[in-house]
A protein has these predicted regions:
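Extracellular/periplasmic, surface-exposed regions of secreted and cell-surface proteins
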Residues: 1-223, 281
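A short local loop/turn or secondary-structure capping micro-motif enriched for an aromatic residue
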Residues: 24-25, 140-141, 248-249, 294-296
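Short, surface-exposed charged micro-motifs
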Residues: 4, 121, 228, 240, ...
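A signal for specific C-terminal beta-sheet/loop modules enriched in small/flexible residues
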Residues: 19, 99, 134-135, 148, ...
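Conserved C-terminal beta-signal and adjacent last beta-strands/turns
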Residues: 174, 187, 265-293
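Flexible glycine/proline-enriched surface loops and loop-helix/loop-strand junctions
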Residues: 100-102, 257, 267-269
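C-terminal beta-signal and adjacent terminal beta-strands/loops
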Residues: 57-61, 139-140, 196-198, 277-306
Length: 306
C-alpha cells in the first residue's frame, strides 16, 4: 500500500507526506507488516516580491530551502530466516537421515531507520549552474546481525535483531553546470559526500572474521589488528606493538590477540565523483573520475609477508 500527498501554495511553499505499508514473507506472519512514513517541507524564497531580493535574483533564479523526516525499514538478505530448514540428503547407519541446516528465528523483525535531511537548492543564471547542499542524519536501530551463540545449539551464530544501532551523519554537495554557445557545449557534474558512521547500543564488542570490530563509539568498518612495529634486524622476525600485564607499552615478536587494537577504518570519510562532457562541432570528449579518502585499505595477502 502506497499513498502520497503534495501541496504547493503559489509555487513558494511546499509540503508533502507519504505512507507505505510493506509486507514480506522473509518474516514470520506476526512480524511481516512494516508501516513507514515521511513528511517534507520546502520554501522557495526567490518567488517572493521583496525589493531587497532583486539584486540577488539577478544571479540566483532559484533559492529553495528544504527539510524532510521519515521512517523506513530494512529486510534481511535471506528468505527463510523464520523457518527451521532441514537437509534430507544425509545418511546415518546405512539409512537416510535428516539434518538441521538452519535454526528458525521466529521473532525476527524489520530494521528501523529514522532519517532527517535539511538543505538548500540553488539555481544560477537561469539554471545553467545548479547547486544542491544537504545535511543528513540517519539513525538505524534493531540491527539484523549474526550474533555468536553457544555451540551446544549446533550453531556458532544466529541472525537476530539486536540492541545495536548505527548513527550516520554527513553532508552532500552536488554541482551541475551547463556552459554553451553556438559552437560548443560543456556539461560539468561534481558530487561530494562526507560520512561519519558509528555504532551505539552494543552490549559487547563483536569481532568479525574479516579483521574488523563492532564497538560502541567506533566507526563502522574499524580495522582491529596487531599494529606493525617493524622487523627485528637481528632475527628478521616481525615486531608488533603491545601492552604488558602492567599496562605498559611494549614491542614484541608475538602476534598475541590481546595486542590487537583499532588501527584504522575501512569506510571513507569523503567520497565523490566528477563527470564532464565537452562537445564541439560534432566531436565529444568525456571524462569520469571517482575519489575517496579518509579510510584505510587492508591487504590480507601483503599482511602475511615479511
Amino acid at each position: 500500500i502506497v499513498t502520497r500527498a503534495d501541496y504547493s501554495y503559489r509555487y513558494r511553499y511546499f509540503i508533502g507526506g507519504s505512507f507505505r505499508q510493506d509486507r514480506s514473507s522473509r518474516f514470520s506472519p506476526e512480524h511481516r507488516t512494516g508501516n513507514f512514513w515521511s513528511v517534507s517541507a520546502a520554501y522557495r524564497i526567490t518567488n517572493e516580491n521583496w525589493a531587497w531580493l532583486d539584486p540577488v535574483k539577478r544571479i540566483f533564479n532559484n533559492i529553495k530551502f528544504k527539510a524532510s523526516y521519515g521512517y523506513n525499514g530494512n529486510l534481511p538478505s535471506k528468505y527463510y530466516n523464520w523457518r527451521t530448514l532441514y537437509n534430507g540428503s544425509g545418511r546415518y547407519d546405512s539409512g537416510h537421515a535428516l539434518s538441521q541446516t538452519f535454526r528458525a528465528t521466529y521473532d525476527l523483525s524489520w530494521e528501523k531507520n529514522n532519517v532527517f535531511n535539511v538543505g538548500v537548492d540553488l539555481g544560477m543564471f537561469r539554471d545553467r549552474i545548479r547547486i544542491s547542499a544537504e545535511y543528513y542524519s540517519r539513525k538505524s536501530t534493531d540491527l539484523l546481525q549474526e550474533v555468536p551463540v553457544s555451540q551446544v545449539s549446533g550453531y556458532s551464530t544466529m541472525l537476530m535483531n539486536t540492541s545495536a544501532g548505527i548513527r550516520n551523519r554527513g553532508f552532500e554537495l552536488d554541482l551541475d553546470a551547463h556552459i554553451l554557445n553556438k559552437l560548443f557545449k560543456w556539461d560539468l557534474k561534481l558530487n561530494m559526500a562526507t560520512l561519519s558512521a558509528k555504532y551505539f547500543g552494543l552490549e559487547q564488542d563483536i569481532i568479525g572474521s574479516n579483521a574488523q570490530i563492532m564497538r560502541n563509539g567506533q566507526s563502522v568498518g574499524a580495522w582491529y589488528l596487531n599494529k606493525f612495529a617493524g622487523i627485528d634486524s637481528n632475527t628478521g622476525q616481525v615486531l608488533y606493538y603491545g601492552v604488558d600485564e602492567y599496562g605498559n607499552d611494549i614491542i614484541s615478536n608475538s602476534d598475541n590477540p590481546s595486542f590487537r587494537r583499532i588501527v584504522g577504518k575501512g569506510v571513507p570519510t569523503v567520497s565523490g565523483g566528477f563527470n564532464t562532457l565537452f562537445s564541439y562541432r560534432g566531436w565529444d570528449l568525456s571524462a569520469l573520475f571517482t575519489y575517496a579518502w579518509g579510510h584505510d585499505v587492508y591487504d590480507s595477502r601483503a599482511a602475511g609477508r615479511t
